[in-house]
Amino acid sequence: MLRTVLLGKIHRATVTGACLEYVGSISVDSRLLAAAGILPHEQVHVVNLNNGARLVTYAIEASEGSGAVVLNGAAARLAAAGDQVIVLAYGQGTAVELEHHQPQVVYVDAQNRIVSVHRSVEHAG
């Protein structure tokens, strides 16, 4: 049986724009995608911490070092510049394949610069 687990996460990124007329997706600074292990065109879930919206789309690369996090197409209706979002990518594997799996979690500052990268999820509490 395959199980679905978190592969990579960009935590509390700041939305830098929304482009309703674009065909779709979320554009993310390629440096952030690479750090989280998220591939271009990979399915991602986006959670908006400001309004609670959740959506599924795919990631595309924005210019490296730009700090860009832009929701495109219909998703642009679910976020505004300045909102904080979490970008999550999931994968599947067997229990054996996942026995030692740890997700890549990227923490960023208000300008979407990488603060730290961890191979586990820290729990609040």
Curated annotation (Swiss-Prot):
Is synthesized initially as an inactive proenzyme, which is activated by self-cleavage at a specific serine bond to produce a beta-subunit with a hydroxyl group at its C-terminus and an alpha-subunit with a pyruvoyl group at its N-terminus. Binds 1 pyruvoyl group covalently per subunit. GO terms for molecular function: aspartate 1-decarboxylase activity. It is found in: Cytoplasm. The modification Pyruvic acid (Ser) is found at S25. SUPFAM superfamilies: ADC-like. Substrate binds at T57, G73, A74, A75. InterPro entries: Asp_de-COase-like_dom_sf, Asp_decarbox. Pfam families: Asp_decarbox (PF02261). Its EC number is 4.1.1.11. The keyword Phosphoprotein does not apply. Keywords: Autocatalytic cleavage, Cytoplasm, Decarboxylase, Lyase, Pantothenate biosynthesis, Pyruvate, Schiff base, Zymogen. Transmembrane segments: none annotated. One of its GO terms (cellular component) is cytosol. The active site is at S25 (schiff-base intermediate with substrate), Y58 (proton donor). Pathway: Cofactor biosynthesis; (R)-pantothenate biosynthesis; beta-alanine from L-aspartate: step 1/1. HAMAP family: PanD (MF_00446). Heterooctamer of four alpha and four beta subunits. Belongs to the PanD family. Catalyzes the pyruvoyl-dependent decarboxylation of aspartate to produce beta-alanine. This is Aspartate 1-decarboxylase 2. It comes from Gloeobacter violaceus (strain ATCC 29082 / PCC 7421).
